[in-house]
Amino acid sequence: MLGFRSPIRLCKLSALGSTRLLPISRPKLFSTAVARYAADMETVNTTKRLARLRQLMQEHKIDVYIVPSEDSHQSEYIAPCDGRREFISGFSGSAGTAIVSMTKAALSTDGRYFNQASKQLDSNWELLKRGVENVPTWQEWTTEQAQGGKVVGVDPALITASGARSLEETLKRNGSSLVGISQNLVDLVWGKDRPAPPREKVRVHPDKFSGKTFQEKIADLRKELEKKKTAGFVISMLDEIAWLFNLRGSDIPYNPVFFAYAIITPTKAELYIDDDKITPEVVAHLGQDVVIKPYNSIFADAKALSEARRKEAGETASKFLLSNKASWALSLSLGGEEHVEETRSPIADAKAIKNEVELAGMRACHIRDGAALIEYFAWLENELVNKKTVLDEVDAADKLEQIRTKHDLFAGLSFDTISSTGPNGAVIHYKPEKGTCSIIDPDAIYLCDSGAQYLDGTTDVTRTFHFGKPTELEKKAFTLVLKGLIAIDTAVFPKGTSGFALDALARQYLWKEGLDYLHGTGHGVGSYLNVHEGPIGIGTRVQYTEVPIAPGNVISDEPGFYEDGKFGIRIENVIMAREVQTTHKFGDKPWLGFEHVTMAPIGRNLIEPSLLSDLELKWVNDYHAEVWDKTHHFFENDEFTRSWLQRETAPITK
């Protein structure tokens, strides 16, 4: 699943060597469904909502109001009750910032969502395309609106401390100011229609899957805190808390996390969570090692803890560690910048390097997940081509989920399945909805990006198929993307190399044709946790220069190509970084490479063998042989699927 953006313009497929696209035959039923495509991206009339928000802004004496996407834990994916930016703007993508002045409103988002946002925003909104030349950032737009000593407001729980400071400094130079408003104004506009916060029970994640007890993890964390000479660590990121305590929850769809905070000091471990989420099993699991406290007492406790520390040690008091993703509100509760050390979380670094138990779980769950995908694609082709069944995108996605549920340790999906036919595949984060989605056309490209949660790991895989006869242009585009995937998969590089440095390997073949894609090449993947996991990744984000790829990292490898209004192509495998043996060891340092764990055939009729080198063709055939070896036993009593798999994994020749 696509996690991160790349600020580069989309190019046209005509650059592949033709000035026009060959016509794609579509039955009338498909054409009708595509005509309804815009309905899937319905706009919401935000006039009344904006009017009410502006009334509240006047009452609070602010001129500009910022509405981030994130919740108070800076989560990428959020619970329905935290969908404030979507409520006020109508834009449902996972990333973006809304800004409202007394006369204007703007929505900033990245390249994954340009198409979607342009369809969902009504006439009240201006779309700020992030990374596009001559388009202001949301910070620049805000500063422009706040000229002349105006006041900008934001909920301090929804913006990072560093983000607030940066904006505050910019506004000061403009004679303006930033204020935190603890009562969220969008919540007041939303009123009684706002969904209730989730109240699901928390579950213990057994050590046989985590590979390490929570006591061992806390001990390791305390060693890191001792090295940094800090008074303690206040933790706000939900996946970090779930990982640290070997607990899982259901508060955010598809992400097995729960709303909580934690404070770890040299002598205490405190978990801040609503009491009604705690079961006797969790109490027994945590035992005497962890004190459970009310969720809403975190800010008061953090303030008291910091003040007590300063009173005891005076000016020499050591600072509290806080993630650089933590909220402005949490930083202020600890006394602000001078009493806090903001840094990349040591838990994020530790979590990103999977232990041997987690790596084994990743391998195992991807084989089971691959079997589900094989059964699904065999079924889908048979329904569309042989039975002539009319299926829409949601019908297909539901069938895939149904198949996955049959496999051991299945615990749900890891994100909304992107089941997309024809032009819908060009919408990078397309979300089909029953009643407005398209009928799947067997004579068009079908892109399916999906993933699942298993107790032993998390999967994320994209496959692009054509169940008819693809055009030469479609085959060429697909093969260029495949070459990029292979380049990352087979890369060998010295320890200390970042994902930023590797990114060009995936893009090089598209670049040679003057083409590109508007998203990152890879993101970290959690172990029965969030499908998007930092701090590592492969892409052009500056953050990726700061964290080198390390053995044990689990990352997606997912180059793509998108022709707006026509089709999308993406191929995605999950890969694991590991040390590799090389003939030489320049610099006397370890050399790294990748091991792929995704096991599903790559659409063979979209591959143009003449565009592959001999080594690339060998990689494809070796990969398909591995898929066959590891999955065919699932279909001993299913001759149809077994035959389909055998056909799709047979050697390809030039």
From Swiss-Prot:
Its EC number is 3.4.11.9. Mn(2+) 2 binds at D449, D460, E572. CDD domains: APP. Binds 2 manganese ions per subunit. It comes from the Eukaryota. The keyword tRNA-binding does not apply. It is an enzyme of class 3 (hydrolase). Keywords: Aminopeptidase, Hydrolase, Manganese, Metal-binding, Metalloprotease, Protease. SUPFAM superfamilies: Creatinase/aminopeptidase, Creatinase/prolidase N-terminal domain. GO terms for biological process: proteolysis. One of its GO terms (cellular component) is cytoplasm. Catalyzes the removal of a penultimate prolyl residue from the N-termini of peptides. This is Probable Xaa-Pro aminopeptidase P. It comes from Aspergillus fumigatus (strain ATCC MYA-4609 / CBS 101355 / FGSC A1100 / Af293). The gene is ampp.
